[in-house]
Amino acid sequence: MTPAELRATLSLASIYGLRMLGMFLILPIFAIYASTLPDKPSGFMVGLALGAYGLTQALLQLPFGMASDKYGRKPMIYLGLGIFAVGSMVAALAMNIEGVIIGRAIQGAGAVSAVVTALVADLTRDEHRTKAMATIGGTIGIAFAFSLVAGPILNEWMGVPGIFFLTGVLTLAAIAVVRFVVPDPISSHYHSDASAAPAKLMDVLKNTQLLRLNYGIFALHAAQMAMFVVVPFAINESSHLDVNQHWKIYLPVVLVSFLLMVPGIIYAEKQSKMKQVFVAAIAVMLFAQIMFAFSIHY
C-alpha cells in the first residue's frame, strides 16, 4: 500500500470501529441498567433497545450507498455520523425504555457502513482492497472485544447515559477525522465488490447460497443480542459480581476466544477448509447455547 492508501484505510477503519464501539459499549451493562428505569421494561423491550439500531441500519444501508454515488462519499458520511451523534444524545437523555429505543433506532439510521466501504474502494487499488476490507473487519472484532471489557469500567465512571454522551462526542470528533485526515477521492465510481447495486437486488435475494449466509449472519446477531438480555443477570447471580466488575469475566473469555480463533482461521486458510471450520464454529456455538439453556435460571 502507498502511504495515502494506508492512511485512508486506517482512518476509515477507525471511523468504522468508533461507530461500532458506540453500538457495543452498552451491551454488557444495559440489561441491568434497564431494570432500574421507572417503567421496569420487559425483556422484549430491553432486547428491542439493544437491537433497534440493526433494524434501521438494515433499512437505510442501500439508500445511503446509493445517495453516496450521487452526492459524494464524504457528505453522506458526515450526514450519517451526525445522525448517529443525535441518536446517542437522545438515548443519553432518555428517561424510559421507549426513549432509549428511539435513540438506538436513530443511531442505526446513520447507516454509513456501505458508504465507508465504497470510499475505501475509491481510495485503494484493486490489489490492496482485500487487505483494506480485512483491516476494517478486524477493527469491528476489536471494537466488540474492547466493548465487553470497557463497558463495565466506563459504567462505573459515568453510567449508561454518560456512555451514550461520550459516544456522541466521539462521533462528532470522527467527522473531523473524515474531513481533515481521510484523503479526498480523485473520483467516486461504482465498484462491483464494494458499492450498492439496487438493480441486482432481486438476483441477490434469489441466490440460495447468499441466503444461507445471510440467515447465518442474522441468526448470529439475533443470538448475540438475546444473550445480552440475560447474561448480565446470570453473571450477577452466579458470581455475585457487581455489574461494574463484569469485565473480570469478559476479559479472560475474550482472550481465550482470540487464542482459539486464530489457529482455526490459519488452518482454514492454509488447508482450504473454510467451510469445515465454519461449520465447526457453528457447532461450538450451538453447544454453548445448550449449556447456557441448562445453566441459566434467570
Language-model regions: role of each:
Residues 103-141:
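Cytoplasmic helix-loop-helix junction between adjacent transmembrane helices
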